């Protein structure tokens, strides 16, 4: 099935089990829809999504923007598998950020809500205290186009309640963040994502752990690192 939505063309090459996820903010006329480009990355599609879901790297990779020392701790948050829509959600996510958005006048504790709408598509809802209330939160979308099991094209889309920043400033803000992530992703070995045993999670990884368990429940194998007890790596 082929479908046009949210400025992209979507393709389902298998049996379609559910309709394309809803993104209601995209249809709000006063909100600003900001396509931020597509980026080739040598990594697994699943690694790309999991990096997007991680807050712990903010102070170290996005220093002075999404985080900064000494505010490095990830506060406990809630994670749930919403079975009625088959999505993973994380709520009550808070992180102190020096520059939460181009329009942010000062550092703030930012509230995040993460939504994994499908294995290769994730959405971040980010409360912008400088916003005017046109939409409940700014929206940052990561749509992964797999080119192979270890090579992706990452598409970024923002839907913002920002009536003051220029389009260029908004795009450059998101591009800077992603280009900081890219070398981390490309040097993260193995490139494919191990779903269990090989990597040890911490409390900050509750969302990533839920994502991996969700993939296991789906018997997902594309882009997954296969590790056997005999030490064979596929």
PLM regions: where:
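C-terminal catalytic domain of Rieske-type non-heme iron oxygenases
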Residues: 17-234
């Amino acid at each position: 099935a082929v479908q046009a939505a949210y400025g992209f063309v979507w393709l389902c090459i298998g049996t379609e089990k559910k309709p394309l996820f809803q993104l209601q903010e995209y249809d709000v006329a006063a909100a600003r829809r900001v396509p931020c480009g597509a980026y080739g990355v040598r990594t697994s599609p699943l690694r790309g999504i999991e990096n997007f879901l991680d807050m712990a790297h903010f102070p170290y990779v996005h220093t002075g923007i999404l985080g900064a020392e000494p505010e490095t701790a990830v506060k406990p948050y809630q994670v749930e598998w919403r079975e009625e829509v088959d999505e993973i959600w994380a709520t009550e996510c808070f992180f102190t950020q020096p520059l939460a958005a181009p329009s942010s006048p000062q550092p703030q504790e930012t509230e995040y809500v993460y939504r994994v709408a499908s294995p290769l598509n994730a959405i971040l809802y980010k409360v912008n205290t400088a916003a005017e209330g046109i939409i409940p939160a700014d929206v940052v979308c990561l749509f992964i186009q797999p080119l192979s099991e270890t090579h992706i094209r990452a598409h970024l889309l923002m839907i913002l309640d920002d009536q003051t920043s220029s389009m260029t400033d908004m795009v450059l803000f998101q591009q800077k963040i992603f280009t900081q992530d890219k070398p981390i992703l490309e040097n993260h070995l193995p490139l494919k994502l191990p779903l269990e045993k090989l990597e040890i999670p911490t409390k900050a990884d509750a969302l990533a752990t839920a994502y991996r368990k969700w993939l296991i429940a789906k018997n997902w194998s594309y882009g997954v690192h296969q590790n056997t007890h005999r030490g064979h790596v596929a």
